[in-house]
Regions:
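Class I S-adenosyl-L-methionine
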Residues: 1-199
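C-terminal target-recognition/interaction regions appended to catalytic cores
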Residues: 123-291
């Protein structure tokens, strides 16, 4: 899910994620989570997503985690997050910040989900673990790998004219990407003051791309604009380039309307990350069968 999942809603931080963890607890599962930026692990897009790995309380993996936490307490939970848990072997960490939270979400702390929803508020961090209704969360620092720059996914063949910005459109794009401090009008006639900072225009091709949204390719502030490597003219990304940013093969979405190709990639996960997790789950499943 999106990275803000662990913080929502704004007026009761952590409530929604607490509900998710409590539901897993009631279903007999432990949960480890990590907020991962794909660019930190060598990908071409700064795409942050919250990944949850749940494991049932009748597995050897659960018993190992529960035993360690029972003996070592929060130090044991910390060890699992930084070294021995689900994510650390495939997405290693450099360390952690001195920010953490811990507590209980079980029936002794909250009678039921209604009770939890009304009262629970907590600051969850980018790494965390919930076992037997007890959670521990810490702000982790990723061990950063060399990233792929945006220029590495750009097509170098001649492209259709529809991807290029016309001279008449440049000023409008500059406005969309630029800083704003202006009075705007609501539908009911009232006014409000709108402010936002500037964005790079065009996008820097020596850095990973920003997070793609489902509106990628449309005329919007969030759409990437690059200097074409062949002509140096400004243009938007092509569907193939969007597929590459997520680690899909070229033309993976071919055959659907172009608008939906952009929409699909704006909703997608970064494939190499999911592939690494799939291999990790497969290895843990084999270990479970041998235990």
């Amino acid at each position: 899910n999106v990275d803000r999942l662990i913080k929502s809603p704004a007026w009761q931080k952590g409530r929604d994620f607490s509900i998710i963890l409590r539901c897993f607890y009631e279903a007999g599962y432990a949960v480890e989570w990590r907020v991962i930026n794909a660019a930190d692990y060598g990908e071409a897009q700064r795409r942050r997503r919250t990944f949850l790995f749940a494991f049932r309380n009748d597995t050897a993996l659960f018993r190992k985690a529960a035993d360690l936490i029972c003996v070592e307490g929060l130090k044991g939970a910390h060890q699992l997050l930084l070294q021995d848990g689900f994510f650390a072997p495939i997405f290693p960490l450099y360390g952690f910040e001195r920010k953490y939270s811990e507590g209980w979400l079980d029936e002794f702390r909250y009678l039921d989900l209604k009770d939890l929803s009304a009262a629970q508020s907590c600051h969850f961090y980018t790494s965390g673990l919930m076992v037997n209704g007890r959670f521990y969360s810490v702000e982790s620092i990723p061990l950063q790998f060399p990233y792929k720059p945006l220029c590495s996914v750009l097509e170098i063949t001649p492209l259709a004219e529809r991807y290029f910005l016309s001279a008449a459109d440049i000023d409008h794009w500059r406005y969309l990407k630029g800083a704003k401090q202006e009075t705007r009008h609501r539908r009911n006639g009232s006014t409000y003051f709108f402010s936002e900072g500037s964005m790079a225009f065009p996008d820097r091709s020596d850095l990973p791309a920003r997070t793609m949204l489902t509106s990628e390719g449309s005329v919007s502030r969030s759409t990437h604009v690059v200097a074409d490597p062949r002509t140096q003219r400004l243009r938007t990304l092509t569907p193939i380039e969007c597929e590459r940013l997520n680690g899909f093969p070229d033309d993976w979405t071919a055959g659907m309307p172009e608008r939906l190709r952009y929409f699909t990639m704006g909703n997608a996960l970064v494939v190499p990350l999911v592939k690494a997790m799939g291999k990790r789950i497969s290895a843990l499943t084999e270990d479970e069968q041998r235990s």
